[in-house]
């Protein structure tokens, strides 16, 4: 039988999702733990690779087991969480059809990138402190319009990546202010004017993503927010640009895979 896993992980302790020969990965930790629990070798297939330091709050994976599990799904979830490192949490174990595939069956993936514009020790582990004092988020959201639709996004793809196509379809992309959950105990006040909020996130969803794509998009939109480039520059990048023409990639620790839809 095939089972799906819904899980979260802190990317700081891993080289990413995919197994690497000489570095810890989320996939390796899950396979090792499941194999010990079920007393057979278990292979886990994930919704896609995430890079070093990148986190996930809504990751989906699947594994196969010959027959019924030796204990209930809730018990397996409990035992997994007891054995896994604190950086990985399994939220559910669910039986799925045999043709369910965590990677190839996914029709939409969502990423969220967090930034803050003032020093804050409570969010620094999962948010990038953007050092530019002024960012025009209206211009950045205007630029997001040029990302929507089906395009070749090789201008945001890590160079040297071996993929068959760089074409993706982006369904939504926007910036929005937010209030961190610890803000209620932090000794600071958020302005009632959204534009002055020090805390923002960028959300983007697509049918697929290229390696380093989201971080390169965020870095390019920051250039628009700084006033170094116009919103229309993003349109030109997508149409004719190369990776060298786009903005620098922002750090990976503030990026989350937040949702996978099937």
What are these regions (language model features)?
Residues 1-262:
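Structured-RNA-binding interfaces characteristic of tRNA pseudouridine synthases
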